[in-house]
Amino acid sequence: MDNSIPIESPSLSRRQLLNFITGATVAVTAGAALYPAGKFLIAPAEKTGAGGAILAKDILGKQIPASQILAEPPQTRALVAGLAGEPTYLIVKEDHTLDRIGLVDNCTHLGCTFPWNPLDQQFQCPCHGSRYAPDGSVVRGPAPLPLKIVQVAVIDNSILISPWTETDPRTGKKPWWV
């Protein structure tokens, strides 16, 4: 019984070489065809400014000029696409400026979006009945936490939205989302 390993390795046959070339060609062609499809399906990373700030956009991803929001009557809650595309309420103040605090339209119970009810002066979640005060604090559960807030600034005619990292003015504590 010969337990020795053959010294010579078998050479690649013509058939194996052609199979390898065919497989490599198919793989390269498929990769070249799928790359543009992948780029189309995956949203590009949004460019952010200092501190993660972005420009407020509409539902189509177009920048919203500050003059458009400020033309609304005082106490209007304008819904824009904010950080990471999250729907965010901007509030027009009595002096026709924007409040420096924006509210993210995302219920802290199960993540539903909700409308502002001007008659009751509350945000009311239709999913499970949570209610929020105009500043985003919880009026009635089951929501366990106040709404996430963001910083809002107007520079020239652009609305900048950036993450809120300071003390939460509603609770006096570190924000729960930081």
UniProtKB/Swiss-Prot annotation:
Binding residues for [2Fe-2S] cluster: 107, 109, 125, 128
Pfam families for the chain: Rieske, TM_PetC
Entry keyword Signal: no
EC assignment: 7.1.1.6
Superkingdom of origin: Bacteria
Reported cofactor(s): [2Fe-2S] cluster
GO cellular component: plasma membrane-derived thylakoid membrane
Residues that span the membrane, as ranges: 20-42
GO biological process: photosynthesis
Disulphide-bridged cysteine pairs: 112-127
Compartment list: Cellular thylakoid membrane
Domain Rieske: 65-161
Catalytic activities: 2 oxidized [plastocyanin] + a plastoquinol + 2 H(+)(in) = 2 reduced [plastocyanin] + a plastoquinone + 4 H(+)(out)
InterPro entries named among the record's database cross-references: Cyt_b6_f_Rieske, Rieske_2Fe-2S, Rieske_2Fe-2S_sf, Rieske_Fe-S_prot, Rieske_Fe-S_prot_C, TAT_signal
Membrane topology: Single-pass membrane protein
EC primary class: translocase
UniProt KW keywords: 2Fe-2S, Disulfide bond, Electron transport, Iron, Iron-sulfur, Membrane, Metal-binding, Thylakoid, Translocase, Transmembrane, Transmembrane helix, Transport
NCBIfam families xrefs: Cytb6fFeSPetC, PRK13474.1
Family recorded in the similarity comment: Belongs to the Rieske iron-sulfur protein family.
Anything else known: The Rieske iron-sulfur protein is a high potential 2Fe-2S protein.
Record-given protein name: Cytochrome b6-f complex iron-sulfur subunit 3
Species of the source: Nostoc sp. (strain PCC 7120 / SAG 25.82 / UTEX 2576)
Gene that this sequence comes from: petC3
